[in-house]
Design a protein with these regions (language model features):
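Terminal leader/tail segments of proteins
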Residues: 1-17, 38, 42, 47
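A short beta-strand micro-motif
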Residues: 19-21, 72
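Short glycine- and Lys/Arg-enriched binding-loop motifs that mark or flank ligand-binding interfaces
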Residues: 21, 29, 58
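Short hydrophobic beta-strand segments
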Residues: 22-23, 163
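Short, contiguous acidic and Ser/Thr-rich linear segments
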Residues: 24-34
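General beta-strand structural signal in soluble alpha/beta enzymes
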Residues: 30, 49-50, 54
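Fe-S ferredoxin-like electron-transfer domains
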Residues: 52, 56-163
Length: 163
């Protein structure tokens, strides 16, 4: 697997130590000193997520903790970590990351239909639309809105680590 998007000799990475990781189920490699974001970019991965409301494609635009688009889910099970910022995640052997706010995949997202219906979703529409009947809020409206909100999935099992 070539890394056509990586500079040949410069940078602060250790090219003697290759590190393998998975992103969205596919295996890639990077080097010691890479962040998840830099390794993804080196492997030609530019699409990492979708916007909250309209599910528009999102890629990297920052290089630090201020990155607004590259939020990923790390690992799975009890050790899962939602909303990790890919530009600040150090690449380690066996890292498993997935895109958030997309289904069935980041490249083909059914939620993107919202983009076509944007005339029906003005800013703040949900504050007025889902007011009646009152008892629908917690059982119907809120779960649907939360699922579409683009946040990662919190761990369902207790934390296995001892502190």
């Amino acid at each position: 697997m070539s890394q056509n998007f990586r500079l040949d000799k410069t940078g602060y990475i250790n090219r003697d130590k290759k590190i393998s990781f998975k992103f969205n189920g596919k295996k890639y490699f990077g080097y010691e000193g890479d962040t998840l974001a830099s390794a993804l970019l080196a492997n030609g991965i530019h699409l990492v997520g979708r916007s909250f409301k309209y599910h528009r494609p999102r890629g990297f635009i920052g290089a630090g903790v201020d990155e607004p688009n590259a939020h990923v889910q790390l690992y799975s099970g009890a050790k899962t970590e939602p909303n990790a910022i890919a530009t600040s995640v150090e690449l380690v052997e066996g890292l498993v990351a997935t895109s958030q706010n997309c289904w069935p995949s980041v490249s083909f997202d059914f939620g993107a239909i919202n983009n076509l219906l944007n005339k029906f979703f003005p800013a703040g529409f949900y504050y007025k639309t889902f007011m009646w009947p009152k008892n629908f809020w917690y059982k119907i409206y809120e779960p649907i809105i939360r699922k579409a909100a683009g946040l990662g999935i919190a761990p369902l099992k207790p934390d296995p680590d001892k502190y």
